[in-house]
Amino acid sequence: MKLQYLVALLSVQAVPPVTAGYIHQYALVGSAIRQPIDQKTQREDLNKLVSDSPLLSLHRTICEIESVSNREGAVGEVLLKYLRDRGFTVEKQIVPADRGTNSTAERFNIWAYPKGCPRPKIILTSHIDTVPPHIKYSLHAPDGDFDRAKVRIMGRGTVDAKASVAAQIIAALKHLKSNKDIPLGLLFVVSEEVGGSGMVHFSNSELNTNPPFFHTLIFGEPTDLTLVDGHKGNLRVTIEAKGVAAHSGYPWLGRSAISEILPILARMDELGDIPVETGGLPSSEKYGRTTVNIGTIKGGAADNVVPETASASIAVRLAAGTPEEAEEIIRRAVYDVSGGSTNITVNFPDSMPYPPIDLDVDVEGFDISTVNYGTDIPKLEIHDEELEVKVKRYLYGPGTIFVAHGAEEGITVGDLEKAVEGYSKLIDAAVKRGWPREVVVN
């Protein structure tokens, strides 16, 4: 045997399997060349990694079930059984289908608490619906040397917000295992992604007492494991224009609705960039500038017809002020551009617009951030006006909003596991703080 072949043979060493036997890899020492990993073996190892973890397996179970808004019933049933099997008393709170949908399937909020504790002091809450379309759950090993924490889990809802749901449940179970008397409740709602009717339903129900029986609410959304000290407000706007249809060869015989609406939309598009003094929307040091997104534009029937109608829908993320103040600024801007034309109509279709929402961040050990997206938080009316000590509201969760709703939605095992630690820290702080005095709930 030639010497160089002997040296090469002796230099081949198997890299020991890492992290409890997951992912078999082999390398040539001193070489960048790696033998290809058998795909079937890799898939089996990744699935075993998930199956061996209560957190990861719960997350996989609920992410594999499609739960687009208004079709949350199947994942709800799975969670009901999971929580009952682990000693929770679980209640269904039936929520009617949202307006404008054709769904007749039952769907519901989930209200769960330890036996004998129907009015828990600490509530962890998130949502079980997702945006469409459903994207199949999948596991992906990291490039290079295997690192368990870097295994990536992808699919719809893996971040927003089933990562929070799974982490909250596991954190609650761990605390109740160590102390069954901790007053923990779980609330998982539907339709967060399409207006928040699930949380509104809970807010209007007899479970939301006056004064509240709870002193802490921990909301779960993708926050990159930071504790959020607030998020922007939200206001929806629709603008409609009426014209007169005519043959495009004789446009002077009609009036273009699109031509009427375009300068108004141009003005709307800049309202967040100009000072209030010159007719713009307000900004703040904490949240930055108010942003305006013209989300949809519709109009016309064909390219050879002068358009009779045109419309646009707009989302405004408020950095300061109230929705009422923003509505007045928008009405004034539309009036100024249109000259008060009766062919233009402005509406604000959201029944519950809200200003910027400030949140609590008084628990040590977290990085602090603000976010631009909306949540269910303002949809839950808290009746603590007469209380000296107000209900605490925290917003925290695993994953980044930057991939939520997209084709590449995904989260690492490490971030998901860290979220359990984060929720546990928030629970510990709430238990330590306790309730300063007895409150009689009617």
Curated annotation (Swiss-Prot):
Residues carrying a glycan:
102, 343
EC identifiers of the protein:
3.4.17.-
UniProt remark on cofactor binding: Binds 2 Zn(2+) ions per subunit.
Q: Which Pfam families match?
A: M20_dimer, Peptidase_M20
- Alphabetically list the UniProt keywords: Glycoprotein, Hydrolase, Metal-binding, Protease, Secreted, Signal, Zinc
Entry's InterPro entries? Answer: Bact_exopeptidase_dim_dom, Peptidase_M20, Peptidase_M20_dimer, Peptidase_M20A
A cellular-component GO term for this protein: extracellular region
What are the names of the required cofactors? Zn(2+)
- Answer yes or no on keyword Hydrolase: yes
Q: Which residues bind Zn(2+) 2?
A: 160
Gene3D superfamilies of this UniProt entry?
3.30.70.360, Zn peptidases
Q: Where in the cell is it found?
A: Secreted
State the signal peptide span: 1-20
Active site location? 192
Q: Which GO terms describe its biological process?
A: proteolysis
Residues where Zn(2+) 1 binds? 160, 193
Sequence similarity: Belongs to the peptidase M20A family.
PANTHER family xref list? ACETYLORNITHINE DEACETYLASE, PEPTIDASE M20 DIMERISATION DOMAIN-CONTAINING PROTEIN
Protein's name according to its UniProt entry: Probable carboxypeptidase PABG_01461
Species this chain originates from: Paracoccidioides brasiliensis (strain Pb03)
Origin organism lineage: Eukaryota, Fungi, Dikarya, Ascomycota, Pezizomycotina
